[in-house]
């Protein structure tokens, strides 16, 4: 079963997978133990303090060193002129990295006029890591 957790929701124990909309990221600190977190192409849209909060919430001791799959641009200029960088996301030296490399399957996106594909302005990187909760 799959569910969406909104701002008033809590983890539904009947669901195998729960989606949390980006604007409700603070819910992560309220949910029961999770084994896996996935973020694809949205941390690159956030300011670094928000990204660091995500990781802090995921590192909560309830989650017992969860797996985190992160797939985002290496760097991106935000609308306010700031730059967000994958390497600055709050990774720690005591995290256990499974892989960390360029993502071959997500380097382009569809465009409509003219129809075709366009490369992102920065390569996409993905990382699978056990986040140390201690």
Segments from the language model and where they lie:
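Flexible loop/turn segments at secondary-structure boundaries
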Residues: 26-27, 45-47, 76-79
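Hydrophobic adenine-recognition pocket in adenosine-nucleotide-binding enzymes
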Residues: 42
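Short, conserved loop/helix-junction motifs that constitute active-site signature segments
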Residues: 31-32, 57-64
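A short, conserved alpha-helix within the catalytic core of class I
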Residues: 45-58
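Conserved beta-strand signature within the Rossmann-like core of class I S-adenosyl-L-methionine
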Residues: 62-78, 84
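A conserved beta-strand element that flanks and buttresses the S-adenosyl-L-methionine
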Residues: 37-38
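S-adenosyl-L-methionine
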Residues: 1-31
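Rossmann-like AdoMet/SAM-dependent catalytic core
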Residues: 88-134
């Amino acid at each position: 079963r799959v569910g969406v957790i909104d701002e008033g929701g809590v983890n539904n124990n009947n669901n195998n997978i729960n989606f949390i909309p980006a604007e409700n990221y603070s819910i992560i600190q309220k949910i029961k133990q999770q084994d896996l977190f996935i973020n694809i192409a949205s941390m690159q849209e956030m300011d670094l303090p928000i990204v660091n909060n995500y990781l802090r919430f995921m590192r909560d001791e309830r989650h017992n060193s969860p797996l985190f799959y992160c797939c985002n641009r290496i760097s991106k200029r935000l609308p306010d002129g700031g730059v967000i960088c994958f390497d600055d996301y709050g990774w720690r030296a005591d995290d256990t990295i499974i892989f960390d490399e360029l993502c071959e399957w997500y380097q382009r996106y569809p465009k409509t006029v003219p129809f075709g594909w366009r490369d992102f302005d920065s390569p996409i990187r993905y990382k699978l890591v056990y986040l140390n909760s201690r």
